[in-house]
Amino acid sequence: SPERINPGDKKNNLNQINKILAYEGESQKVKTLLKNVYKKICKKLIFSKNIKEAETAKGIENIQRDLNIALFNEILIICNRLNLDFNEVIRLASTKWNFINFSPGLVGGHCLPVDPYYLTYIAKKKGYKSKVTLSGRYVNNYMKKYVIDFANFYLRKSQIKKNKIKICIVGLTYKYGVSDITNSQKIEIFKHFKKKFKQTKCYDPFLKSADNLKFNELKKYNFFIFLSKGKKFSNIANLVDKKKII
């Protein structure tokens, strides 16, 4: 039974999603047993007689999302190089009826940074080397370096002395709304700036950390690097000078 719930998503919870249940062979008894257990917690059950096919389906669900995010990450990079407004480009593209909009970002968590490698590894053993799937992984893994380089360029441009720079990293968990830091590239970004600038702290109400600031302490900081987007972070933009936001 591949896991399908989306942490932090209150709408698509275990009760609401289509639940895939896989079993081998023709045993009606096994199917009935699975049905009797899962119907108590899931509204819709989808059955498969092949466990490998069910697990592959789970893999491509994550690969598809990983690739979509990678595409928008790459578009963001290109727009920045061409001095174009990424948000305006996407707004215009979104007026086409079949355009699918995604947000660029730092991919983390238990699934997206990991699952693509399971399928590409097996495919390689069978004689096929993945091109598209691994390209998406390359782009999404690169985003950590891209964010660090972009922020460092901005900080150098400010011409503020190193010992006067006080950085607040906004959002450290792998996605907004969860307390999980599994495979979070944001942690690595935070470590980079913490090592380089001693006066570096974070603000993430979903995370318990000694470096976590309280909301009323934010005014003391002169640079803010936003790594997550969400309701609890939107007030910061109103609190501080927009020139301080990276």
Protein language model features and the residues they cover:
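Structural/interface elements that position substrates and couple domains in central-metabolism enzymes
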Residues: S1-I246
